[in-house]
């Protein structure tokens, strides 16, 4: 499960950094709350010239686990952190 987020251009660099760090902290706390998460990493793009601001990488045993995670209230709450600043999102789910 790989997700990229782009924040709105009109959001200041300072506000982006605050929101990105809050999101990272919230997502990285999820494995303690959602047992189906095998691994999660959130990378913050420090290169302002690039399109995507946040990269989220996570591992699950099954696609059903991904679906469970996607609708879990703690995950939904973490996603709300980006609600006002997110411009776009790209997601890829694949099996190994």
Descriptions of predicted regions:
Residues 9-17:
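N-terminal presequence-like segments and adjacent domain-start helices
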Residues 1-7, 41-70:
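Short, well-ordered beta-strand segments in beta-rich or mixed alpha/beta enzyme
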